[in-house]
Amino acid sequence: MINYKPFFDTLKRKGITQYKLETEYGLSKGTVDNMRHNRSITLYTVEELCKMLKCEPWDIFEIIVDKV
């Protein structure tokens, strides 16, 4: 399972609000909503987020392995 908690932690650490993401960085509300609910986003979006936030992919998401 992919979890986007690191993304929201990164935003907090950098002092970036959801409003700023949408207005200054052009990220859609739908993308933020998908991430808030741990739904999929494209690799292109991950790449763009890394460029915008000057961070690495692990600052955007983490993979949680389900125990069988």
Predicted features and spans:
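Key DNA-contact positions within bacterial/archaeal DNA-binding proteins
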Residues: 19, 30, 58
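Recognition helix of helix-turn-helix/homeodomain-like DNA-binding domains
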Residues: 26-41
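Short, charged recognition helix plus adjacent turn
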Residues: 9-13, 34, 61-68
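A short, Lys/Arg-rich alpha-helix, primarily the initiator
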Residues: 1-19
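The alpha-helix within a helix-turn-helix
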Residues: 11, 22, 50
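Residues that mark the N-terminal boundary/hinge immediately upstream of a DNA-recognition element
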Residues: 17, 42-45, 56
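Short, basic-rich loop-to-helix N-cap that marks the start of a DNA-contacting helix
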Residues: 38-51
